[in-house]
UniProtKB/Swiss-Prot annotation:
Family indicated by similarity: Belongs to the NRAMP (TC 2.A.55) family.
Region annotation (Disordered) ranges: 1-44
InterPro entries per record: NRAMP_fam (IPR001046)
Cross-referenced HAMAP family: NRAMP (MF_00221)
Species, as recorded: Oryza sativa subsp. japonica (Rice)
Lipid bilayer topology: Multi-pass membrane protein
GO annotation terms (biological process): iron ion transmembrane transport; manganese ion transport
Protein name: Metal transporter Nramp6
Domain of life where this protein originates: Eukaryota
MF term (GO), any: cadmium ion transmembrane transporter activity
Keywords of the record: Ion transport, Iron, Iron transport, Membrane, Transmembrane, Transmembrane helix, Transport
Biased composition (Low complexity): 1-18
Localisation per UniProt entry: Membrane
């Protein structure tokens, strides 16, 4: 059931005034009766599951006249003062979101960029992370301002055929990401067991313990967030330890961050660095995670304060992720840049190469790498399953218990992942598989980015929280850049892989259908069609 605009609720009230109507019409579309709506519509979090953040309850413009003076004085004085306690209460969703910037696919992109390009692509890693932050802030804005997540909003925004296509694309992206994440964790288990546990056994262990970790949510969202904090800290300590042990050249590091440099030899690695940053499922995930705090989207001051703290938290989280990615890139740049091994390094054999290059030390670097990779694989697998719950529930409006949705989501990925583990148990095979999975992720990016920008730009959806024209221009520019970069990756990949007339013809048909759907999403989300129609009418009038 689509929610009624807040303006409609205000009009229905006999006590409402014209001023009240105007104030309500500027607020986002939210359910008029949350209890009734919860019976009909799937929700990211039930009211009893949400964390109380004690946002200052300043009256809004629609309160009675006696309190309106206080509202005016509060508005005049600005947002309530910053509170470290409130920031702590809001901390969690941003760090869960940042896991997608640290998954095994990103780590493989980091190590290959370091081995092939040295420190020269660190500036691109910084800017790619900044672009990723912009996209994730938009996702958080949608979730907080509307009280609904992106999959739910897409269900109401698009016709049935389009939303089914979007759901299918999101699920395909989810399965592809999940295979990478579970395989990464399984590789780590194989390393830490010294080869005793084969890849398929690591896959089964990862799939099972994912349910154990997710069950912690039954004891409160904060318990699950604490687990992720431990996993991120484990990654940070492991890769910082590697960074310290290998003693990279700090001058080259800072030059790499500050001085843009790109050669034809490193274009593929550059595209990989950018392509790993935007994970389609992560956009859906973040828009749902921010609803874990008790915020009334009908209260403008509560939304503004929540967005303030979420922005700070997300920035800190992605700054941490940038440092971890930097550690991995510089370690492999130090050890393998300019060597004959540079083109052969992948997740499966990276630990062995590190061991041969840097030796044992106090604690063998092979196991340090394995621990960091295990933390990355476990955390990203859990968030992937979490995202799958929201995607399926939002698009299909399934009122199922969370453990059932987790089981369904996990089932989509576990069978193909076990097959992959059985047939791709060698480094070369895993590298080929990873290339195909990266292509799969790249194909899906427009189907998360375009709906997000479309919805966050609509006053009917966002009310006063819709982004302005300048921000729209920036976001569409970033989206175009990301889609173009990933398009280059697709062109480069398919031009080397596709052979023969039949396969080429099939690819052309697929590209035409793909481009048509992307164009449909863009035109539906902009004013361009209306402008064209207006221009045509004027020319014939």
């Amino acid at each position: 059931m689509a929610p009624l605009p807040a303006a409609a609720t205000a009009t229905a009230s006999s006590a409402a005034t014209p001023a009240d109507d105007e104030a309500h019409s500027l607020l986002p579309s939210t359910p008029s009766n949350e209890e009734d709506d919860d019976d009909l519509e799937e929700r990211a979090y039930e009211a009893t599951e949400k964390v109380i953040v004690s946002i200052s309850d300043f009256p809004d413009a629609d309160d009675d006249e006696e309190e309106s003076g206080l509202a005016t004085s509060t508005a005049a004085s600005g947002i309530p003062p910053f509170s470290w306690r409130k920031l702590w209460l809001f901390t969690g969703p941003g760090f869960l979101m940042s896991i997608a910037f640290l998954d095994p696919g990103n780590l493989e992109g980091d190590l290959q960029a370091g081995a092939v390009a040295g420190d020269t692509l660190l500036w691109l890693l910084l800017w790619a992370t900044s672009m990723g932050l912009l996209v994730q802030l938009l996702a958080a804005r949608v979730g907080v301002a509307t009280g609904r997540h992106l999959a739910e909003l897409c269900r109401d925004e698009y016709p049935s055929w389009a939303r089914r296509a979007l759901w299918l694309m999101a699920e395909v992206a989810m399965v592809g990401a999940d295979i990478q994440e579970v395989i990464g964790s399984a590789i780590a288990i194989k390393i830490l067991s010294r080869g005793f546990l084969p890849l398929w056994a690591g896959v089964v262990i990862t799939a099972l313990d994912c349910f154990i970790f997710l069950s912690l949510e039954n004891y409160g969202v904060r318990k699950l967030e604490a687990v992720f904090a431990i996993l991120i800290a484990t990654m940070a300590v492991s890769f910082a330890w590697m960074f310290t042990d290998t003693k990279p050249n700090m001058k080259n590091l800072f030059i790499g961050i500050l001085v843009p440099k790109l050669s034809s030899r490193t274009i593929r690695q550059a595209v990989g660095v950018v392509g790993c940053v935007i994970m389609p499922h992560n956009v859906f995930l973040h828009s749902a995670l921010v609803q874990s705090r008790k915020i009334d989207p009908n209260k403008e001051h509560q939304v503004r304060e929540a967005l303030r703290y979420y922005s700070i938290e997300s920035t800190i989280a992605l700054a941490v992720s940038f440092m971890i990615n930097l550690f991995v890139t510089t370690v492999f740049a130090k050890g393998f840049y300019g060597t004959k091994e540079a083109g052969n390094i992948g997740l499966e054999n990276a630990g062995q190469y590190l061991q041969e290059k840097f030796g044992g030390g106090f604690f063998p670097i092979l196991y340090i790498w394995g621990i960091g990779l295990l933390a990355a694989g476990q955390s990203s697998t859990i968030t992937g399953t979490y995202a799958g719950q929201f995607i399926m529930g939002g698009f299909l409006n399934l009122k199922l218990k969370k453990w059932i949705r987790s089981l369904i989501t996990r089932s989509f990925a576990i069978v193909p992942t076990i097959i992959v583990a059985l047939f791709f148990d060698k480094s070369d095979s895993l590298d080929v598989l990873n290339e195909w999975l990266n292509v799969l992720q790249s194909i899906q990016i427009p189907f998360a980015l375009i709906p997000l920008i479309t919805l966050v730009s609509k006053e009917k959806v966002m009310g006063v929280f819709k982004i302005g024209r300048n921000t729209q221009a920036v976001t569409w520019t970033v989206a175009t850049l990301l889609i173009t970069i990933n398009g280059y990756l697709l062109l480069d990949f398919f031009s080397s892989e596709i052979r023969g007339l039949l396969s080429g013809s099939i690819l052309c048909v697929a590209v035409l259908a793909y481009a048509s759907f992307v164009l449909y999403l863009i035109l539906r989300g902009t004013e361009l069609p209306n402008q064209i129609i207006t221009t045509i009418r004027k020319s014939f009038s």
